[in-house]
Amino acid sequence: MAPADAPLRDLLEALTKRIVEHPDEVSVEQFEEGDGTVVLELAVGDDDYGRVIGRGGRTASALRTVVKAAAVREKKRVLVDIVD
């Protein structure tokens, strides 16, 4: 993980911890694909999975939008993947 990309990971983690009921179960893994895209894999506890996805995927979409907006400011491409 490159130190310059840590703010994106930290942003996603901070936003998610404010949404879930069990913030200690939130983890974000980060790696970079060959084309330079930063991939953030978000994992939450089983009880919080539905809360992070939201009705119709709205919460997940909002999280992705905020992180992508931050990535644009840093001239990065980012992909947020919510893993179960």
Residue ranges of predicted features:
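Glycine-centered tight-turn and secondary-structure capping sites
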Residues: I53-G57
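RNA-contacting regions in translation and RNA-metabolism proteins
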Residues: M1-Y49, A62, V66-D84
